[in-house]
């Protein structure tokens, strides 16, 4: 069975065609600058990337270009669109309505639209992608996989904020969490990799990318996570502030003469390690800067690592222990220095690190020593494969 996985942003679209029987990626790519001038990147398995400049006024034209590339006579991955058996869509926010993935129906889409307020930057783009696929691929079953769904098992004590309860009742203001597809995939995969029973386990997943979040997974269920109503809460990130004193918003607004949108723009796009360093949101640049003696780059790495360690410590308390810590995503998988700094704070848990293993790159690595009281792993995430698996499970 072939599943087309679609991840729509406001001006970009990522896609993969996955054979669910072998879990092989048949083709993948990216549409960029939708609504501007348009660029399609397409790569069939085993071949070089092809980049085509092409107008994409809307998401529908972008998806049409993807479908045309998939069946191209020379470089297509399939002979005809009849070989696409299902489509899996990433949907950022499912609110409280969706605790799991769902087959896309008119009723389901209406329920997703009701969550628009919770993710105004993402949900409209997700819906545009879904509707474009429905128009271009009528009759093909489609599934929505929600970033928030995995975290819907959190207890009330973890998701309620210390705000007037009526805001929760009226507006559903609460912690939702994000990156759920990744947290779910990695927690299941690390248990399998280590031969552990996930239903009798305490796992902390650190999804550290430009957007970063941590989750506490007790017996296979999420009991807490660092992102909140929006992806702005929690860890210090690439350009997002993470947790701050809320009164800073008023303070900065007055000092800098900004309105609420201006302050939110600073917190979302000009803060995090980029804001601290004044250099970059990319950890490769920060490491180079630190090695060259840039004190602010060094400070950014320290602040980031310290916040990760603090969250891990709090989730050890939330679960009354931990068996496994799994690092994943761009920084989690590729920045040994960050893992090393984070784990240095966690010696009290009886963690000992195999520095040689920590320096390696590759699939599924244990980086703790055999006598470490907590097993620490690096597990590459694969959100597209997770979406394909969810899609197959519902369509079959």
Enumerate the predicted regions with their spans.
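Glycine-rich beta-strand-to-loop/alpha-helix junction loops that act as flexible
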Residues: 9, 89-92, 208, 322, ...
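Extreme N-terminal starter segment of soluble prokaryotic enzymes
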Residues: 1-4
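Glycine-rich phosphate-binding loop of actin/hexokinase-like ATP-binding domains
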Residues: 150-254
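Short glycine-rich, Thr/Ser-proximal phosphate-binding strand/loop in the N-terminal lobe
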Residues: 12-56, 228
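Short beta-strand-loop/turn "lid" adjacent to the catalytic site in phosphate-handling enzymes
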Residues: 70-122, 143, 149-158
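Adenine-nucleotide phosphate-binding core of ATP-dependent small-molecule kinases
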Residues: 265, 272-276, 283-318
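Internal helix-turn-beta structural module
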Residues: 298, 302-323, 332-396
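Catalytic phosphate/nucleotide-handling subdomain of diverse soluble enzymes
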Residues: 218, 224-259, 265, 329-360
């Amino acid at each position: 069975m072939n599943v087309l996985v679609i991840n729509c942003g406001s001006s970009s679209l990522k896609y993969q065609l996955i054979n669910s029987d072998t879990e092989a990626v048949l083709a993948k790519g990216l549409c960029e600058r939708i609504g501007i001038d348009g660029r399609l990147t397409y790569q069939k398995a085993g071949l070089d990337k092809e980049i085509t400049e092409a107008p994409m006024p809307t998401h529908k034209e972008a998806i049409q270009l993807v479908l045309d590339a998939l069946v191209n006579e020379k470089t297509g991955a399939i002979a005809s669109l009849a070989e696409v058996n299902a489509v899996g869509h990433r949907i950022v926010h499912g609110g409280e309505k969706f605790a799991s993935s769902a087959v896309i129906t008119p009723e389901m889409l209406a329920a997703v639209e009701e969550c628009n307020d919770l993710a105004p930057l993402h949900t409209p783009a997700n819906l545009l992608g879904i509707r474009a696929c429905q128009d271009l691929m009528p009759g093909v079953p489609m599934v929505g996989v929600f970033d928030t769904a995995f975290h819907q098992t959190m207890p009330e004590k973890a998701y309620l904020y210390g705000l007037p309860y009526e805001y929760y009742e009226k507006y559903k203001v609460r912690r939702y969490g994000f990156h759920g597809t990744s947290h779910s995939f990695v927690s299941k995969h690390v248990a399998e990799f280590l031969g552990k029973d996930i239903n009798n386990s305490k796992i902390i997943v650190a999804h550290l990318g430009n957007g970063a979040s941590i989750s506490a997974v007790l017996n296979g269920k999420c009991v807490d996570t660092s992102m909140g109503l929006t992806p702005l809460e929690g860890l210090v990130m690439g350009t997002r502030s993470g947790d701050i004193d809320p009164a800073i918003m008023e303070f900065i607004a007055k000092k800098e003469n900004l309105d609420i949108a201006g302050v939110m723009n600073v917190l979302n796009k000009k803060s995090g390690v980029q804001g601290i360093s004044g250099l970059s949101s990319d950890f490769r640049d920060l490491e180079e800067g630190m090695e060259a003696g840039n004190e602010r780059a060094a400070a950014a790495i320290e602040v980031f690592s310290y916040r990760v360690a603090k969250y891990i410590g709090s989730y050890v308390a939330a679960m009354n222990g931990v068996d496994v810590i799994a690092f994943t995503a761009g920084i989690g998988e590729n920045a040994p220095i960050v893992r090393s700094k984070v784990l240095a704070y966690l010696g009290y848990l009886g963690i000992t690190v195999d520095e040689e293993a920590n320096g390696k790159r590759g699939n599924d690595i244990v980086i703790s020593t055999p006598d470490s009281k907590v097993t620490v792993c690096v597990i590459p995430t694969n959100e597209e494969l997770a979406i394909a698996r969810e899609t197959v499970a519902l369509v079959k």
